[in-house]
Amino acid sequence: MTKLIYLIGPSGAGKDSLLRAIRQLSLPHLLVAHRYITRPAEIQGENHIALTPEEFAIRQQLGIFALNWQAHQCHYGIGIEIDYWLQRGSDVIVNGSRAYLTQARERYGNTLFPICLTVSESALRQRLRARGRESEQQIAMRLQRAEEEQNRLQSDCVLLNNDGDLQHTLSTFQSLLPLDRACTAHRE
């Protein structure tokens, strides 16, 4: 059975870095989906398709998104192509939203495999400051939200710590594959 790996975690936890590393592995059975976001693309940021709010609204009205949500004054969407990929037998990984996990679960049921990328508060603060996107007040708000969301995670979310070396996190992620045999057995 194919799986939709729903990667979640606070901003700055390293989701984009992990997705880039997974993409570089070129695993034949795992496709990395991109997101559509109403913010400009960044050189070091997430590999996404930048849309204006108007473009996003048109695509949303046309039903082009399998999943979509709003956070941090932006709209986010995952294209319906992921449904085709799953139907064709590929596992798919998406950069999801912690707040939208319940809706994703409703749409995908047992196909959904949520992984929460965790990181210590000190590492998260350091990463948020280093990327330079947020003010100190925004960083404080993101740290508070990260703690609140961590406390609300569903028990079926696999926790994947990313405090250390990205290669270690990538190896731990790979140990979860093949997903049909490992998806409920691993919790770090």
Swiss-Prot record:
Residues that bind ATP: 9-16
Statement: the UniProt record of this protein carries the keyword ATP-binding: yes
Protein name listed in UniProt: Ribose 1,5-bisphosphate phosphokinase PhnN
Stated role: Catalyzes the phosphorylation of ribose 1,5-bisphosphate to 5-phospho-D-ribosyl alpha-1-diphosphate (PRPP).
Reaction(s) catalysed (UniProt annotation): alpha-D-ribose 1,5-bisphosphate + ATP = 5-phospho-alpha-D-ribose 1-diphosphate + ADP
SMART domains from the UniProt entry: GuKc
Taxonomic lineage from the root: Bacteria, Pseudomonadati, Pseudomonadota, Gammaproteobacteria, Enterobacterales
InterPro entries the record matches: GK/Ca_channel_bsu (IPR008145), Guanylate_kin-like_dom (IPR008144), P-loop_NTPase (IPR027417), PhnN (IPR012699)
Annotated keywords: ATP-binding, Nucleotide-binding, Transferase
Species name: Pectobacterium parmentieri (strain WPP163) (Pectobacterium wasabiae (strain WPP163))
PROSITE patterns: GUANYLATE_KINASE_2
Group of enzyme by EC: transferase
Highest taxon of the lineage: Bacteria
EC number: 2.7.4.23
PANTHER family: GUANYLATE KINASE-RELATED, RIBOSE 1,5-BISPHOSPHATE PHOSPHOKINASE PHNN
Pathway annotation: Metabolic intermediate biosynthesis; 5-phospho-alpha-D-ribose 1-diphosphate biosynthesis; 5-phospho-alpha-D-ribose 1-diphosphate from D-ribose 5-phosphate (route II): step 3/3
GO biological process: 5-phosphoribose 1-diphosphate biosynthetic process; organic phosphonate metabolic process
Family from the record: Belongs to the ribose 1,5-bisphosphokinase family.
MF annotations from Gene Ontology: ATP binding; ribose 1,5-bisphosphate phosphokinase activity
GO cellular component assignments: cytosol
